[in-house]
Amino acid sequence: VGFKAGVKDYKLTYYTPDYETKDTDILAAFRVTPQPGVPPEEAGAAVAAESSTGTWTTVWTDGVTSLDRYKGRCYHIEPVAGEESQFIAYVAYPLDLFEEGSVTNMFTSIVGNVFGFKALRALRLEDLRIPTAYSKTFQGPPHGIQVERDKLNKYGRPLLGCTIKPKLGLSAKNYGRAVYECLRGGLDFTKDDENVNSQPFMRWRDRFLFCAEALYKAQAETGEIKGHYLNATAGTCEEMMKRAIFARELGVPIVMHDYLTGGFTANTSLAHYCRDNGLLLHIHRAMHAVIDRQKNHGMHFRVLAKALRLSGGDHIHAGTVVGKLEGERDITLGFVDLLRDDYFEKDRSRGIYFTQDWVSLPGVLPVASGGIHVWHMPALTEIFGDDSVLQFGGGTLGHPWGNAPGAVANRVALEACVQARNEGRDLAREGNEIIREAAKWSPELAAACEVWKEIKFEFPAMDTL
């Protein structure tokens, strides 16, 4: 029988409802909104085809390929509750389609061309199941949660951070001064803002030197190990590595990278360097909302979070649930646990579509940051637990008495919440009272409580289940 040219329906080849998924398959859950008149099976099959071996017409070289071995398969379709023309298409990809240890290649296939596909009005990748066989080809986070605690000698509480503001325009010397004041006041970390790279007002080398000086001075005075996330993100990979190497030569404990704008290839290289050289790696997710904010199109942040755990990072920003940026409680907690835990059961109420076994890939500390202040401390301590970093930028530097008292207020509030929790008190119910009690013996905290007593960022979340 000769080669049969022509166009045939995707569903004839790529829709296989009786397929049993393998332990080695990468599984994806897509939220599909087809164009009017396109049946769900055809749309789901089209997604499977276009993100694996298919093209729009039958080609001669199909005959010299083992399609059964390499094609993606749409194996299940379910309607989305409350949405008329939307459904979840589950697609299984054979492991052989992906290069080992490359998040870049995985995303190029799964979320590459298919998102521009005309037969679909919109497409969103809701979740991925990474099989053990694939996750074992990645190094993952440079160090992980336990190693970080051991390096910093800090146990039994969340870590405290602060992003130095104004984010742009400070000179290196003044920037270092702000870093020193915050660390001296009781914070564990300070942070470069994500867009501080190496601009005319502050070149990277000057910033690194002044921040290192600030950090060593604060360390000597407090007897605690301190860190400042030195942002190594740069225009080229070579320049990024140069900055990371300089940070290591200064002896600082941690560097930082913007993993979405910097790219997964650069991020994975940096993560490998960090593990080899004992640097912790803080990851900022600038640009994530471009990809994950729309409910119908793009990619959910939980997928970006899984990708980061593979690519490598010790901290990642994960929303606050209570501050100024997007994040619903159950959904946020779903991907927070997914970042920290070794094994995670499927749980649709938290947006988790697949059971994920990370087989001892190190965990990532979630970072809560964005519009939070001392009144949020009980809620944050309860929601995120000990394994997290709570970052107060304006909530430290906006203190009426200055940066160091702002840091003191946050540290006192945190220690009060941790102590109350350990005594068995209910942080959700008694939170305000716990903060008020602590403020009685901390004038710095009392002043902070007064400034921010009315501030709220109450808008409904865009991305609901």
Curated annotation (Swiss-Prot):
<keyword id="KW-1015">Disulfide bond</keyword>
<dbReference type="InterPro" id="IPR020878">
    <property type="entry name" value="RuBisCo_large_chain_AS"/>
</dbReference>
<keyword id="KW-0602">Photosynthesis</keyword>
<dbReference type="InterPro" id="IPR000685">
    <property type="entry name" value="RuBisCO_lsu_C"/>
</dbReference>
<feature type="binding site">
    <location>
        <position position="317"/>
    </location>
    <ligand>
        <name>substrate</name>
    </ligand>
</feature>
<dbReference type="GO" id="GO:0009853">
    <property type="term" value="P:photorespiration"/>
</dbReference>
<dbReference type="InterPro" id="IPR017443">
    <property type="entry name" value="RuBisCO_lsu_fd_N"/>
</dbReference>
<feature type="binding site" description="in homodimeric partner">
    <location>
        <position position="113"/>
    </location>
    <ligand>
        <name>substrate</name>
    </ligand>
</feature>
<keyword id="KW-0479">Metal-binding</keyword>
<keyword id="KW-0150">Chloroplast</keyword>
<dbReference type="InterPro" id="IPR036376">
    <property type="entry name" value="RuBisCO_lsu_C_sf"/>
</dbReference>
<feature type="binding site">
    <location>
        <position position="369"/>
    </location>
    <ligand>
        <name>substrate</name>
    </ligand>
</feature>
<keyword id="KW-0560">Oxidoreductase</keyword>
<comment type="function">
    <text>RuBisCO catalyzes two reactions: the carboxylation of D-ribulose 1,5-bisphosphate, the primary event in carbon dioxide fixation, as well as the oxidative fragmentation of the pentose substrate in the photorespiration process. Both reactions occur simultaneously and in competition at the same active site.</text>
</comment>
<protein>
    <recommendedName>
        <fullName>Ribulose bisphosphate carboxylase large chain</fullName>
        <ecNumber>4.1.1.39</ecNumber>
    </recommendedName>
</protein>
<dbReference type="InterPro" id="IPR033966">
    <property type="entry name" value="RuBisCO"/>
</dbReference>
<comment type="subunit">
    <text>Heterohexadecamer of 8 large chains and 8 small chains; disulfide-linked. The disulfide link is formed within the large subunit homodimers.</text>
</comment>
<feature type="active site" description="Proton acceptor">
    <location>
        <position position="284"/>
    </location>
</feature>
<feature type="modified residue" description="N6,N6,N6-trimethyllysine">
    <location>
        <position position="4"/>
    </location>
</feature>
<keyword id="KW-0488">Methylation</keyword>
<dbReference type="GO" id="GO:0016984">
    <property type="term" value="F:ribulose-bisphosphate carboxylase activity"/>
</dbReference>
<dbReference type="InterPro" id="IPR036422">
    <property type="entry name" value="RuBisCO_lsu_N_sf"/>
</dbReference>
<dbReference type="Pfam" id="PF00016">
    <property type="entry name" value="RuBisCO_large"/>
</dbReference>
<feature type="binding site">
    <location>
        <position position="194"/>
    </location>
    <ligand>
        <name>Mg(2+)</name>
    </ligand>
</feature>
<feature type="binding site">
    <location>
        <position position="167"/>
    </location>
    <ligand>
        <name>substrate</name>
    </ligand>
</feature>
<keyword id="KW-0460">Magnesium</keyword>
<feature type="modified residue" description="N6-carboxylysine">
    <location>
        <position position="191"/>
    </location>
</feature>
<feature type="binding site" description="via carbamate group">
    <location>
        <position position="191"/>
    </location>
    <ligand>
        <name>Mg(2+)</name>
    </ligand>
</feature>
<keyword id="KW-0456">Lyase</keyword>
<keyword id="KW-0601">Photorespiration</keyword>
<dbReference type="InterPro" id="IPR020888">
    <property type="entry name" value="RuBisCO_lsuI"/>
</dbReference>
<feature type="active site" description="Proton acceptor">
    <location>
        <position position="165"/>
    </location>
</feature>
<keyword id="KW-0934">Plastid</keyword>
<keyword id="KW-0503">Monooxygenase</keyword>
<dbReference type="GO" id="GO:0019253">
    <property type="term" value="P:reductive pentose-phosphate cycle"/>
</dbReference>
<comment type="similarity">
    <text>Belongs to the RuBisCO large chain family. Type I subfamily.</text>
</comment>
<dbReference type="GO" id="GO:0000287">
    <property type="term" value="F:magnesium ion binding"/>
</dbReference>
<dbReference type="Pfam" id="PF02788">
    <property type="entry name" value="RuBisCO_large_N"/>
</dbReference>
<feature type="binding site">
    <location>
        <position position="163"/>
    </location>
    <ligand>
        <name>substrate</name>
    </ligand>
</feature>
<dbReference type="GO" id="GO:0009507">
    <property type="term" value="C:chloroplast"/>
</dbReference>
<dbReference type="GO" id="GO:0004497">
    <property type="term" value="F:monooxygenase activity"/>
</dbReference>
<keyword id="KW-0113">Calvin cycle</keyword>
